[in-house]
């Protein structure tokens, strides 16, 4: 069973993603900030994928991606955003983002993005 670290500062979004992913057989670890996500990654080496929102206070999704890449070059990271900005996609890919999904999305779109990532 794959474990996904879901990072979003909106609790409603976390709850929705947790329910959707768990009903499809994934284990879910939640974080409400980039800092909390990094703490989880330090403590739990069993995380298979990071699914993070882009727009968060203190540390956005790309900043989180950069911090992850400083310590782990292979952990898959998918960024979710409501900003359909092509420049944002280019910047994310420059930092070795594995996937990018525009909000709003349905669970099937997210699962397709997750399943397109080869696990380390």
Q: What do these predicted ranges mean?
A:
Residues 63, 84-99:
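Alpha4 helix (beta4-alpha4-beta5 surface) of REC/receiver domains from two-component response regulators
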Residues 30-39, 61:
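Helix N-cap/capping motif at the beta->alpha junctions
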Residues 56:
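Receiver (REC) domain active-site loop signature in two-component systems and cognate sites
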């Amino acid at each position: 069973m794959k474990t996904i670290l879901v990072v979003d500062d909106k609790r409603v979004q976390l709850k929705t993603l947790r329910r959707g992913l768990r009903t499809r057989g994934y284990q879910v670890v939640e974080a409400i900030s980039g800092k909390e996500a990094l703490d989880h990654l330090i403590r739990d080496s069993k995380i298979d994928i990071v699914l993070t929102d882009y727009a968060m206070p203190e540390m956005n999704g790309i900043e989180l991606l950069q911090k992850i890449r400083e310590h782990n070059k292979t952990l898959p990271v998918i960024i979710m955003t409501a900003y359909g900005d092509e420049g944002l996609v280019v910047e994310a890919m420059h930092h070795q983002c594995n996937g990018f999904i525009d909000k709003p999305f349905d669970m099937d779109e997210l699962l397709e993005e997750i399943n397109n990532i080869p696990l380390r």
